[in-house]
Each structure stands twice: as structure tokens, then as C-alpha cells.
Amino acid sequence: MALSLAQNCVPSAFNPLVYGTEIKSLESHLVTNYSASVPEAYRYTSPSVELQNATFCNITVTYTHPGQNDSIVAEAWLPTEWNERFLAVGGGGWVAGRFFLSYNAMQGALADGYATITTDAGLGSSVEPSQWAQTSPGNVNLYNLQNLGSVSLNEQAIIGKSLIKSFYGQAPKYSYWNGCSQGGRQGLMLAQRYPTAFDGIAAGAPAINWNKLFTFIQWPQQVMNELGQWPFMCELDAITLAAVSACDELDGVIDGIVSDVKQCLGTFDPFSVVGESTTCAQLNGTRKIITSAAATVLNATWHGREDYHGILPGADLTGNSPRSFGQPGIAATDCTEKGCAGTPSNLGTSWLKLFVAKHATLDMAKLTREEFDSLAYSGTQQYASMIETSDADLRAFKAAGGKMVTFHGLADNIIPPGGTEDYYNAVADVDPEVREFYRYFEAPGLGHCFGGASGSPTGLLHQLRDWVENGTAPEKTPIKITVGNATHDRILCPYPQTSVFDQDCGDASKAGCWSCSGGVSVANRAKRSAQRWNEL
């Protein structure tokens, strides 16, 4: 079987036609003795795995939409030892796919026997969009943005299924999607706009409400610019640690994790630590007094803009603390003994400058609040239908038999979890039987897609597959958390339920001492924060 499949790995064996496209080139070659170590961090919903001596057909399809001057590359890996299933993977940040995170996910898929595919949406692998955002100064390349937003995703599914049928002589029995962040947004877009593309979708920390999200990512920097003060990162880190210390035991267990983020957001006052001192790495280890400006920036970031949620207490905001785990901070500053300047994320600045204002040299540091708010509104006006993925009507996905699971870390330091909660609630408003096809898991302590005191929900993809193929919906999912130097077993529960520790059981390190509590209806739910930040 493997030998005959290997003989099929020639360009002439494939003809992946997609209506409205034209194939520019198709290359294939057989890869043998391929091995890789894949960490769980890059798989999101599956455990770490060792890929050993795999043999697969690597197929690269380059195509265009005639008249649009684009060039999209889809890359598929078809293993000779196949489980008769298809797993497509997503991208991250500004990248649709075909970069290191996608390739790690594909390596993991191969190890589990899946045929797998990724696409670059015609954008290449650059982590920032300046190379493709505009056709000329002031003119956005709407075709490229459309390809990133939606079009290439459906084509990725069609091409993948066509290649699979040509190679194996049969279509996949089941098709799945797995992604986080940009990949999570892509998963939601597939469920909303292409409801028959995949049987099961795992969409972690999705970048829903794209314009509001990317505007919010710039929000802490805007607050600092308006204040005319850019706090030392050690000040923000110290307030974050104070919040963790104050809110840790709200769930009845002291473990360094803020689980009851809503109560923490409503009760902990960041201004309560103003005037205290903290050791500051940006000042070569000397002490720094925590300023009111630092508390103001952090408070604004926690509560979010008037129309959008904020990052929650416990999440790293600087990328400089032990809680960052190498992830960037949206409230980062660059400091010397003379003072600090803001260091904004290119996610927010690139979006607002290149796409919304269409002005690559716009000085973001000089925007007034009125100008900033105007940009935010304009972005939604221009691009909501193209990339937002906020459509809550998933009835076509449900009717097609689709199942979806979403997770979001409550210590996510880039994408506010409140947006994912709001989306699930909105879906429930359209279809009160949402649990029949869609479940959402909040993960206390988990950072953006991975990292943090909590591990990733590594059983979720297997549970999704069991739901699709056997009708067994996930009632909980296992995770591991780090407490000091020890690893504890816990569970996550489908929203709106939460995991609760049984004090009589006595051992918080055992998953059996935790259970899901609360009703399953999202009716009469409380908003995550009653406050939105309107004034400095």
C-alpha cells in the first residue's frame, strides 16, 4: 500500500480545480525518514508528540484568481500511513499559514496519521503586512485582505480534499480544522461562511471583531501618549503581581492563578499600590516608586475601550515579566534612567496605519482621542464584512452536522477573552440549543494560545473528533497547571460552567477533586465588566 501510494506522488496525479482560480504550478515530491519533536504549545489542542521516520507526499499548489494579480500557495502533506482523515491548520498574527507554527502543527498532524494542509493566502510568511497591504501608497490591496479574511480558507479545504482523493483514491471520511489566534479567527470564518468545509473545528483564542481587537491592542499605548507618561514596565508588572496575590484565593485554592477574573476585576484597585516601590530591571535593579500613571494605564487596559473588552487581571502586559513566557506585551515601554517611550505592537499600528488610515508614515504617538476613536470607527465601517468573523448565525453549520470547540486563556495578553465569551453568548441568542454543536472553554492561567501557569487543553481535538464521529460531546477537558515546581491535574468546563474544587476531597492537585458547577444556559448572564474606560 505504502509503495503504491509513493508512486502516486507525481504532479500528473493531481488536478485540484477550484472554480474561479487558475493553477500556475503544481510540484510534488516524496519525503522519507522525516522526524520531528512537536511541543504541545504549537498544537494547541493536542499533546506533544514525536514524529518518527514518516513518509509523505509534499504537494505545493500555486494558483491565482485571474484578474486579481495574486499568487496563493497551498502546501499539503499526505502520509503513506493515513488515518483516513483530513486536518487543515491555521496561521497566526498577520500570517495565514506556511510558517513555523503551521509547520509544527502539520508535523503533529502527520504523527497522528492525518493528511494536512496550510495556505499562505498569497501573503508569504512575513510577520508584518507592509509588503502586501497596499498596491500603491494610500491604496489598500483589497484582494489580499479578502484572501486572508476568507477566500483562501475555503480554497484550502477544496484543494486539500481534491489532493487527498487523487492520492488515496478516496475522499477523507472526516475533515477537521485546528488553529489559534489568527487560526481561531479562520476557524470561525469557516463555520460562518463555509459551513460544509469541515466536520469539526477547533478554534482557540479567536481574533473576533478584528478591527476592534487591533484597535484595542494599540489602546494602552494611546493612553500613555495622552498622559504624556510612559511607565517603567516593572511598575505594571508589580501591579499585576499584586492583583494575582489579592485575587488568587477567590476560587478557594492558592495556586498563583486568577480564576475568578470577573470578581477580581470588580474588586481589586490598581491604585491601591501606587506609592509602593518595586525592583526595576530597566533601572539596573534599583527600586522604583509605582506611579499613578502606571495604575491608570493598567486600569484602562483591564477595562478596555468603550466598545471592547480588556485584558484581564493576571495577564502579562509588558512581555518583560516572568509571566510573559516570551509573548509580547501591549503596554511595553523602552526605558533608560532618563525616562521611557512606548513600544507599540505592530499588530495595532500596522492595521491602523496601513489599512484604516492608509498612511504608512502616520505618527500614532500624536493622535488625539478624537482622532483615535475616529480611526477605530472607520476600520469597522470599511472592513467588517471582510474579516470580522462576528456573525453569530451558525445555523447552516449546525444543519450540516458541524461541531466546534473554542478555548480562550483568561491570562491571554493579546486577545481579550471577553470577545470570545460575547460571541458564544451571541450564538446562543440566535440558537438557544448552541450546546448541541458548539462548546467554549475558558482556561484560567493560560496565556495567548499557550504559555502561562496553565497548560493547553491538549485533549480537546480528540474530544472534538469523538463528538463528530461518535456523538460524544465534551462535558469537561483535562489540563495540567504549574504550581511552584509541581504539576497539578485540573479540568476545564464548558462555559458558562466553571470548575470548582471539592474542599472535602482535599487534594487540589488531582483532577478528581474538581467538578463542573453551574447551569449550562447562558441566559441572564452577567457582562464581564460593567465598566468601560471612557476618561483618563
Residue ranges and their predicted role:
Residues T80-N83, D112, K165-K173, Y194-G200, ...:
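Secondary-structure transition/capping motifs at alpha-helix termini
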Residues M189-A191, T196-E306:
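A catalytic-pocket lid/entrance helix-loop region that shapes and gates access to the active site
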Residues Y438-G451, V483-N485:
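Histidine-bearing beta->alpha loop at or near hydrolase active sites
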Residues I414-G418:
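Conserved alpha/beta-hydrolase "acid-adjacent" motif
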Residues G92-G169, T215, M364-G379, A384-M386, ...:
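Cap/lid segment of the alpha/beta-hydrolase catalytic domain
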Residues N178-G183, G187, D412:
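Gly/Ala-rich beta-loop-alpha elbow adjacent to hydrolase catalytic centers
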Residues V405-H408:
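Short beta-strand/loop motif that positions the catalytic acidic residue
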Residues M1-R85, G97, Y103-N104, I257, ...:
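Catalytic-loop region of hydrolases
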